[in-house]
């Protein structure tokens, strides 16, 4: 394994390749932890943090790819899973829609139609 994993290179790999590499990293991490208990060298102990970060990067890319696949699956559909929907504030989610804002009661419509706005003229 490289000393550090570059994320832009991971994005070009397929999910199967990523999962395979992830398995190798996880076995390496378990071996390093065993070496730590057995009293391993300092460079092995320092490598634990690097491997953990590499595992996190692989998992992040795998999850991004899976989420993107689900987004593509639900693209253009009216109902989407909650975690795929656009994140908005609670207040914005509860705001009235344009149709609801423009809705007028029948009684109000009749008033407006039958009794137009009054025009007032001021005497000079």
From Swiss-Prot:
UniProt cross-references to Pfam families, sorted A to Z: Ribosomal_L29
> Where does it sit, as one GO cellular component term?
cytosolic large ribosomal subunit
Family matches, as InterPro entries: Ribosomal_uL29, Ribosomal_uL29_euk, Ribosomal_uL29_sf
Q: What is the lineage of its organism?
A: Eukaryota, Sar, Alveolata, Ciliophora, Intramacronucleata
**Where are its TM segments located?**
none
Tell me a Gene Ontology molecular-function term this record carries.
mRNA binding
Keywords on record: Ribonucleoprotein, Ribosomal protein
* Record SUPFAM superfamilies: Ribosomal protein L29 (L29p)
For this chain, the family text in UniProt reads: Belongs to the universal ribosomal protein uL29 family.
- Kindly provide the name given to this protein in its UniProt entry: Large ribosomal subunit protein uL29
Name one process (GO BP) from the record.
Answer: translation
Q: Which domain of life is it from?
A: Eukaryota
Q: Does the keyword Ribonucleoprotein apply?
A: yes
């Amino acid at each position: 394994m490289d000393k550090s994993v570059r994320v832009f290179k991971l994005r070009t790999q397929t999910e199967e390749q990523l999962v395979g590499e992830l398995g190798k990293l996880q076995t390496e991490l378990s071996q390093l932890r065993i070496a730590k208990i057995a009293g391993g060298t300092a460079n092995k102990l320092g490598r634990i943090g690097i491997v953990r970060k590499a595992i996190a990067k692989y998992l992040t890319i795998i999850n991004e790819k899976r989420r993107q696949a689900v987004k593509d699956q639900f693209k253009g559909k009216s109902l989407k899973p909650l975690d795929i929907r656009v994140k908005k504030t609670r207040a914005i989610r509860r705001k009235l829609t344009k149709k609801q804002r423009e809705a007028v009661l029948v009684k109000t419509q009749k008033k407006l139609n039958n009794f137009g706005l009054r025009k007032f003229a001021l005497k000079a």
